[in-house]
Design a protein with these regions (language model features):
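Short alpha-helical elements
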Residues: 1-278
């Protein structure tokens, strides 16, 4: 779809309360994927679109739960849905489904065959929970270990202490991805994943090939490296959500959930723009 005046009019957000609010097209993508109300008991009265808008506002602005604006549903209600969907792994499932839809939209197979792996160390706060010191980045906190496909769509994220080396955290991440994307075989990586340790850890987990893309010894200053720029761009996309500027969460489950929310935000906007014409 061409990004012309008609498309701009369809996707403009000036009528929304906040820039993070979903458009009608984005909600049409997300709504069928949310769980229905439970049978029996008190009928559901809350508007799930308002709940999703509140969660996206939290992700985009990075504000505290207590600072959630009053025109959203009550804070306790929004928190309840966020944690319930975290515990049921709904955020992970939504990201998975939207990735496959976006890939098919681009004319690709739903399950990728190649991906790019990297990690991002971020500081934690006094909230507690698992953390560690990344001596290379000089950061005390956690690592977000991600693998996007070659389009830059985040396939999965694994959060762990920052003192876990990349090659030690990679096997668990790749095993989790293989379960969800069974055709994934080839991984592009930087020098932090070089050596036999990672390859030995992946034995018995499928037919993996790890391609190390190193920076040239003669290069001076900034250099765009083939394939590796894809994962750096994905991390930059996720970084548009200020909730991810630091790791504010006590549990790694919540940390992972917010990363998936950021991915869902990107994917729903992408699909709404190109896949659902009026």
């Amino acid at each position: 779809m061409a990004w012309d005046d008609v498309a701009r009019q369809d996707h403009r957000r000036v009528c929304a309360r906040y820039p993070s609010d979903m458009t009608d097209r984005e909600w049409a993508i997300i709504a069928p994927l949310l769980p229905p109300a439970r049978s029996g008991g008190r009928p559901r009265t809350v508007d799930l679109r308002a709940v999703m808008d509140a969660i996206l506002f939290m992700a985009s602005s990075g504000c505290q739960w207590r600072m959630l604006p009053k025109d959203f549903p009550p804070r306790s209600t929004v928190q309840g849905y966020f944690y319930a969907w975290r515990d049921s792994r709904l955020w992970e499932a939504l990201n998975h489904l939207l990735v496959m839809s976006a890939r098919e939209l681009e004319g690709r197979e739903a399950s990728p065959t190649a991906g790019v792996i990297d990690s991002q160390s971020v500081k934690t706060t006094e909230s507690g929970g698992i953390s560690g010191y990344d001596a290379g980045k000089k950061i005390n906190g956690r690592k977000r270990h991600i693998v996007p496909d070659t389009l830059g769509l985040m396939l999965f994220v694994l959060v762990h202490a920052a003192d876990v080396q990349d090659r030690d955290g990679a096997p668990a991440l790749l095993q989790a991805i293989r379960y969800r994307f069974p055709w994934l075989r080839h991984i592009f990586a930087d020098g932090g994943y070089a050596g036999s340790k990672l390859r030995d850890a992946l034995k018995g987990q499928g037919d993996w090939t790890i391609q190390i893309i190193k920076r040239s010894d003669t290069a001076q200053g900034f250099e765009v490296l083939p394939r590796r720029w894809v994962v750096e761009r994905t991390l930059a996309w996720l970084g548009r959500c200020r909730r991810l500027a630091q790791d504010w969460e006590k549990t790694i489950e919540s940390s992972s959930a917010w990363a998936f929310v950021a991915g869902i935000r990107l994917l729903s906007r992408r699909l709404a723009r190109y896949c659902y014409p009026t």
